[in-house]
């Protein structure tokens, strides 16, 4: 197993699972405890893709041989307990658009073409539908409403975060299912940490405008060269708190993609030569 660098105090916040077929994937202890939920977050380990895509690339848009990507999906689903034909993938464009998906959408982006575009978040209350979103530094957001038996999964880069994708997903779940934030178990998945995430002043100005001044010190810090270090984990944490999700029901990753480039794909660490990780969430 490749050594994993956890962040604060080397605290292992996620379970590292190694399947019999060699696939390694991550799960949240808090979500594992919820009856009728299956979830996972992929790593680079256990696939067939080569070179900078090695080996569990789950994207058809990174220049990989499509046959390799299909085999990776087969292996991953065998390991984590999903059905390939039931996966519905997002079409990410750094929006805050959230789509309600059903069994009619199953296979979208994997076994057949999608019939929707520019969707960064998905919600469902239909068992068997497997939501899947893609990453290589951006933030995965998992939402489970055990009261209404509903789930949501969203992609939130800095643009999605500054426009509060977490709030948008909770709003969509409330409108569709009656979800109350106080009932939701939420998780911020593996993504780039503040130490690794340098951004320009233009980005920080958007965060200054979007978040109360009392939070600025928690969210970003300046560098002597005029750049800033941005904390997407804390920004999404604060968005979820402000939306009404209780502190004890919000789970942060403590695992940085950029700090672990041999274990997880990172756009920053690889200078763009990388595959894609994926988050998965379904009702069973």
Residue spans for each PLM region:
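Active-site microenvironment for binding and transforming phosphate-containing groups
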Residues: 1-284
